[in-house]
Amino acid sequence: MQSSNQLQDMLHSINRKSYPAYKSLKGAYQFNKYVLSIDHVQGDPFASPSHISVKIFHREAGFPAEYYKDKLTRITLADYLTRQFEQQVNRYTFRAKGSGKSGLISVTRCGQEVLERTACEITEQGIIARFFVGFPANGRTINAGELEKIFFEFLPVCVEKAFVYRNLSGKDLENTIFLAEDQAYIREELKKRSLVAFVNDGAILPRESGISSKPMKGSVTFSRRKVFG
């Protein structure tokens, strides 16, 4: 594994070269609190963006062990962190300039569902986040200075704010974990009682449209008294 300083040196050495020289960056680099991996480099600035991942060890992230003690909590924590990371990278996407997809920073977009995704994975060693970056260029000439901004200015802030426990709302995360555990309990009870669904009082069932999972504005909330008398 190489250091972040070596990555900077490599960026300086390929600046203004033709775009394929970016492929020499593929590999893993040790930053202060995480490992940055350049897993796949796009062929040109107009192609699908490059694949990047970061690994933050648990000792750096600082999340309580009970938040990733089993599959349910790991999926819930990973989903929560993906949403936090998406919020952060959205502040910086396309702030680095260039042609085509230059400066793009994107994460898999989450819907309302809490699902297991490749965008974030909780392992025994730490947290792995996977995302996409458009490597900057002017035409098809490398603009390494703009990529340096992404890797050394934007990304460290995003990682610090999204994946370090002390920088997040502990209460919000705790409530998210509790909600997931409550949902898992209800699902098990449905099976035991041979039921197909549980609808809570006050639930909004109609959706905004056939392609939206958002609740319809102004709709009547569910009441079991109105249904069953």
What residue ranges belong to the model's regions?
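N-terminal accessory targeting/assembly segments
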Residues: M1-P215
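Glycine-rich phosphate/diphosphate-binding loop of Rossmann-like nucleotide-binding domains
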Residues: G210-S212, G218-K226
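Glycine-rich phosphate-binding P-loop
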Residues: G229
